[in-house]
Amino acid sequence: MPSLSLSKLLRVGEGRMVKRLKHIAEHVESLSPDVEGLTDEQLKAKTTEFRERYAAGETLDELLPEAFSVAREASWRVIDQKHFHVQIMGGAALHFGNVAEMKTGEGKTLTCVLPAYLNAIAGDGVHVVTVNDYLAKRDSEWMGRVHRALGLETSVILSGMTPAERRVAYAADITYGTNNEFGFDYLRDNMTHSLDDLVQRGHAFAIVDEVDSILIDEARTPLIISGPADGSSKWYSEFARIAPLLKKDVHYEVDIRKRTIGVHEAGVELVEDQLGIDNLYEAANSPLVSYLNNAIKAKELYTKDKDYIVRDGEVIIVDEFTGRVLVGRRYNEGMHQAIEAKEKVEIKAENQTLATITLQNYFRLYDKLSGMTGTAETEAAELHQTYTLGVIPIPTNRPMVRVDNGDLIYKTEEAKFDAVVDDVVERHENGQPVLIGTTSVERSEYLSKQFTKRGVAHNVLNAKFHEKEATIIAEAGRSGAVTVATNMAGRGTDVVLGGNPDIIADIALRKKGLDPVTTPDEYEAAWDAVLDEVKAEVKADAEKVRDAGGLYVLGTERHESRRIDNQLRGRSGRQGDPGESRFYLSLGDELMRRFNGSALESIMTRLNLPDDVPIEAKMVSKAIKSAQTQVEQQNFEIRKNVLKYDEVMNQQRTVIYKERRQILEGEDMEGQVEQMITDVVTAYVDGATAEGYVEDWDLEQLWTALKTLYPVGIDHKTLAGEDGAGINSDLSRDDLRTALLEDAHAAYKKREAEIDAIAGENGMRELERRVFLSVLDRKWREHLYEMDYLKEGIGLRAMAQRDPLVEYQREGYDMFIGMLDGLKEESVGFLFNLQVEAAPAQPASGISVTAGSAAAASATAPKPLPTQEAAARTTGTAAPTALRAKGLDDEGPSRLTYTGPDEDGKAKATRDSAADSGDGAASRRERREAARTQSKSNRAPKSKRKR
C-alpha cells in the first residue's frame, strides 16, 4: 500500500472529527424525550415536515439531529432496536461523506438507516450498495420496515428484473442493490433510444456497505456490456463460398508486403451477381464489404499450418516469431471468423464492447459517496486517493475482550488439518461454538469429511447459497455449533452468542407465510410476540456459550489480504462478548510458498521437529504480514493502472453520454445540424483544394463526392466559368466554399420541407434526433472496439522507450476526434439521403425503424414498454406523424453479455434473457429484397466510391 507517512498524514484531524461526531450523537440523544411522546402518526408526519422545511431552505445538516432522532425512535418501535451512541456517530460520519470504520457486530446495517432517511428527505434518491443480491433484498425488507413506518418507499434492484420493474425501484426514496446492478443500469441507460426507457434518475448519494470489498477488491475488474460485433455467421460462410470463384489479378489484387487487398470492378460485379443485389456499395449492403475483404484476406494472406493450425475443429493462431500455438487468442475485426468459414469449422461469434466503465469512475458520479466496513484502516490511503473518502474509526459500543492467539505453523498441510480437527473436537465437547474459515471449497469439504469421521455435527458454507448461509450463520453462535465456511461466506450476518434472534424470528414468520413486503401488516402484528419467544430461547443458551469462552474463530490459512483475515477474526467478540481466535498455517499454504516458505522449512528441518509439532514465532508472523503487504501493494498498482487507462475513456465517455442525453431530452438539433453541414462541406472543399491553383483542382471528383452527401444544386463548370477558353482562374477557395455552403444549406431547407410535408410540423427535428442517436451509437461502438484494439498492443511501445500510457492518451484522443468527424459526415449524409415514408402511428416515438434495415448490425439494450411512472415523466409534446426511415439501425433486442466482478473480485460473465427476435444481418433473401428497394443514394460515404 502507499507509504506509511501518507497513511499517518491522512489521520491528522481524525480526533477532531470523532469529537464532532460525539457532540452530534449527544445532541440527537437529548431529543429522545421529545420524539418518544409522539404517536406513530405524528412520527410519520415528521417526514413531511422535514421535506417542507428542506424545500423552504433548511439544509440537511441543520435537519440532521431531529431527523436522526425520529429515525432512531422508529427503529425502536418497529424492529425493537435503538441506535447506540456509536451508531449515531457512524450515521453522521456517513452523512458527511466518509467511510465509517465499525467493527463486525457493531450494527452497520442499522447505522445505515439514519443517513439514508435524512438524505431521502431531499427527494433525489438514496442508493445503498451491498455485496450480493441476498443482502440487498434482506436489508431492503428489514430496514424498509423502519422507512415505511416513516412514510418512505424502499425498493431493491435484483438481477433478472425487467427494465419496467427497475424504473419503479429507482423511483423509490431508498434503493438497495449490488454494485454490478447499479453500474450496468447506468450503462444500459446510455444505450437506450427513448427517455421512457431510462431507469435511473441521477446519482445523488450512495452508501456502500462493505466498502473495502466493493471499492477496493472488486475495482480491479471493470463493468463491460458486450454483444455480437456482427449479425450472423451465415455471411462468413457465404463469402467463403464466393472467395474461390474470385481470381487473383482479375477480380482483385494483393499486396503481400503490406498485407492488403483491393477489389477490382470485375470482382464487385461477380459478387453482386452471386448475391443477387444491384449495388454492393449502397447503404443496405455496406456491411457486406468487410465480409468480402476478410474472405479474400483469409484466402490469400493467411496460410494453414503457417499462420494458423486447425485442431479439434478450432482455428488456433501460430506465433510468427516463435512458432508456438497461441491457444485462446483470436484475430480481431471478423478475420478469425473468416478463416473459420474458409476451413469449414464452427464459426464462433465475435463479441464487441458496447459500453464499459470501471467501478471507480461509476462511484465518482455520485454527488456524495460514503461507506461502511469493519476493516478500512489498511486501505485508507487508497480510498482517499481514488475517491477522496476519509476513513473515520468509530469506537466500539463496549470494550473488545477477544483473545487473539499467535499463529501455529506446521510442516505439512495434513498435520495442520489433523491439529485443527483435534482442537475443534475438544472445544465442541466443551459446548463452545466454533467458526472455521478456509480459503477454498475443496478445503471446506476436506474438513467436513474429517468431522464426519469423528462424529461431529457441523454445517458447511461455500458462499454460493446466500439465503441458506444467513440462516446457518445466524445459528453459528449456539452452544457446540461447528460451522465450516470459506472466508468470504456469511458476510453481513452477525454471529450472535446463543443465536441471532432477529434472523431466527424472521425465518419463523416466513414459514407461516408472512413477510415484510407482501404482508407487512400481519408481519408487524406477529413480530413482537415471536421475537420475545425467540429471545427467551437464546438467552439461556447465550449464557452457556459465554461460560465456555464465547465464539472460537479458527483460520486454516492466511489470506493475501490482511482485511479478510481481520474480517474473519472480527466475527468473534462482538458487542463486548468473550471470544478467541487463532490461525493454523502450514509451509504448503499459498502465501507461505509465495514468500520464502523454504527458509522456514529448512529451520524446522534443522531443529528436527516432527510434522505434528508446530512452531509459534513472532518472526513468522512478521514475515506473513510483510508478504501480505507486498500482495496488497501489487493489487493496488493493478487497480491504479486500470484507473489510469480508464481515465482516458472516461473523458470521452462523459462527452458522448452528455451529448446523448441532450438528444434524448429533446434538445433542438437544428443549429447543430447547420454547423455540421458547414464543417463537413468545408472539409470536402479544403481537401479538394489543398494543393495547387484552380487549374489543378479536380472539381469533377469533388462534385462526385458531394453528390453522395447531398443533392448539389450548382454546376462546377458554371461556377468555375469553364468555356472554350478554359477555366476562370479568378475562382478562389473561399468563393468555392461559400457557394457550396449556401447551396448545401438551401438544400437542407428544401429537405426539411419535404419531411415536414410527410410528418407534419417538427418531423425533421424528430428525424434529426433519431439519426443522431443511431449514428452516435454505432460510431461509439466502433470507437470502443478500436480503443480495445489499441490497448491490447500499447504495452509494446515501452520497447521503443515510450510511455504506453502517454501513447494511449495521445492516440486515443486522435481516434476520438476522428470518430467525431465521421459522426458529422455520416449524420449529414443520412439526413439528406434517408428514404422516408408515412407509417402507422407508433405509441412510443415519432419515427419507427424498419426491420432488417440497411445499416451495420447493431446491439442495443432491450427496450421495455414504458411504465405508468415513466409515462408521467414524458414531456407531453405532440409527436409528429410516424415515419418509416430506411437505413437506420434496428433497435430490436440482442443478447448481451455482462462482465463484472464477483464477490472475490474476479471477472464473471452473465448473459441477459432478451429474446433473439431476429437476426441483425437478415437472411440472404431478405437482404436482396432490402437492397433492391433501397436507393443508391442512401449511403453516406466519406469520399468518392472507389472499387
Swiss-Prot record:
It is a peripheral membrane protein. The gene is secA. It is found in: Cell membrane; Cytoplasm. Its EC number is 7.4.2.8. It comes from Rhodococcus erythropolis (strain PR4 / NBRC 100887). This is Protein translocase subunit SecA. Residues 860-947 are annotated as: Disordered. ATP binds at residues 87, 105-109, 494. The lineage of its organism: Bacteria, Bacillati, Actinomycetota, Actinomycetes, Mycobacteriales. One of its GO terms (biological process) is protein transport by the Sec complex. It is an enzyme of class 7 (translocase). Monomer and homodimer. Part of the essential Sec protein translocation apparatus which comprises SecA, SecYEG and auxiliary proteins SecDF. Other proteins may also be involved. GO terms for molecular function: ATP binding; protein-exporting ATPase activity. Belongs to the SecA family. NCBIfam families: PRK12904.1, secA. Keywords: ATP-binding, Cell membrane, Cytoplasm, Membrane, Nucleotide-binding, Protein transport, Translocase, Translocation, Transport. Its main location: membrane. InterPro entries: Helicase_ATP-bd, P-loop_NTPase, SecA, SecA_DEAD, SecA_motor_DEAD, SecA_preprotein_X-link_dom, SecA_SF2_C, SecA_Wing/Scaffold. Residues 903-914, 922-931 have a biased composition (Basic and acidic residues). Residues 870-885 have a biased composition (Low complexity). One of its GO terms (cellular component) is cell envelope Sec protein transport complex. Part of the Sec protein translocase complex. Interacts with the SecYEG preprotein conducting channel. Has a central role in coupling the hydrolysis of ATP to the transfer of proteins into and across the cell membrane, serving as an ATP-driven molecular motor driving the stepwise translocation of polypeptide chains across the membrane. It catalyses: ATP + H2O + cellular proteinSide 1 = ADP + phosphate + cellular proteinSide 2.
